[in-house]
């Protein structure tokens, strides 16, 4: 797995080596946590504490997830400085996606109902996308939205590298 500039993403390899998480209180004890065993998408940027992945959803180009590396369920499970650090990454991703994709609106969501592993969805929205004004998990409103800007994973990766602080790890 390559994160950026041809470097092996050691963070993903560490995450990939985990196989099971006991997710107490979520009805998933002993089941596999998808975000502990997979990257959750194409890795665009990674640090020791979190990673940014591109979600493969042709209806929502630019849809990214910011995934906390350690298996925790809620924002309140983090220390205040960790929360701030995670949100700084979420806001950086939002800034880059807005700049590159020029959506009508951005949605930020942290649900975790199906995957109780702390992660944020950063979703560009257009007035004519499949679900607008519903959330992307809601009822489909239309079948054929107009084409939206095509931006490569490499372009997103480079823009994220510039947006996030140079002292942050990139792979």
What do these predicted regions represent?
Residues 1-4, 158:
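Short intrinsically disordered, low-complexity coil segments enriched in acidic
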Residues 2, 14, 26-29:
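Residue-level signal for mature regions of secreted extracellular proteins and peptides
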Residues 8-9, 14:
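Short linear/disordered segments characteristic of secreted peptide precursors
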Residues 14-20:
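Low-complexity, intrinsically disordered or signal/transmembrane-proximal segments
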Residues 20-171:
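HIT superfamily nucleotide-processing domains
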